[in-house]
């Protein structure tokens, strides 16, 4: 009902109005970067400080895992879940690539049953720390630079997405030398 009053609170007009039901659409947003402090973004994978993380790696004949830190930021106005996809280049088939929770040991899973690894529900304004791990068995080596493009995409609207790139620059350690002088004369 609508009522109009005068200065002495006497009803001047009273009428019935229509009821309208409407939904306020919340905006969605995501940023995937390397910052634990803010949701800065330099665009899709490029050489910007928030979008390209590089590590050097030397293969020395032992098994190892290299990890990169990431943060998925919900920059929207509603709780959302973000599917995580990965495109890799120059990665040998013997290497195992995994996405982990912040502890670097617990694998991320598919929390909503759509078949894609995701962040789980993330409230507006919050971030989730994740890690990319690349495991190399002892006999798995490469001298190629490897790129890993990770994309976080909203499950509510798949057009809402953001990507970042990790680069691993590899070299081989071809062996070790140990010089030993058995007669202690100092002559080689």
Question: Positions of the model-derived regions?
Answer:
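Short glycine/proline/serine/threonine-rich loop/turn segments at secondary-structure transition edges
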Residues: 138-149
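Short aromatic-acidic-glycine turn motif
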Residues: 29-31, 89-103, 157-158
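Intrinsically disordered, low-complexity Pro/Gly/Ser/Thr-rich segments with frequent PxxP/GP/PP motifs
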Residues: 102-139
């Amino acid at each position: 009902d609508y009522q109009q009053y005068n200065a002495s609170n006497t009803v001047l007009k009273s009428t019935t109005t229509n009821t309208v039901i409407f939904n306020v659409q919340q905006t969605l947003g995501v940023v995937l970067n390397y910052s634990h402090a803010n949701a800065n973004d330099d665009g899709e994978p490029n050489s910007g400080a928030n979008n390209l993380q590089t590590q050097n790696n030397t293969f020395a004949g032992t098994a190892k895992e290299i990890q990169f830190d990431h943060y998925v930021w919900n920059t929207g106005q509603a709780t959302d879940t973000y599917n995580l996809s990965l495109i890799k280049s120059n990665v040998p088939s013997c290497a195992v690539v995994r996405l982990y929770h912040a502890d670097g040991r617990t694998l991320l899973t598919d929390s909503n049953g759509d078949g894609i690894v995701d962040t789980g529900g993330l409230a507006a304004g919050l971030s989730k720390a994740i890690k990319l791990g690349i495991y190399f068995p002892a006999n798995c080596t490469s001298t190629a630079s490897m790129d890993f493009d990770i994309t976080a995409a909203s499950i509510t609207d798949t057009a809402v997405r953001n990507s970042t790139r990790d680069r691993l620059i590899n070299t081989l350690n071809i062996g070790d030398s140990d010089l030993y002088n058995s007669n202690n004369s100092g002559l080689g």
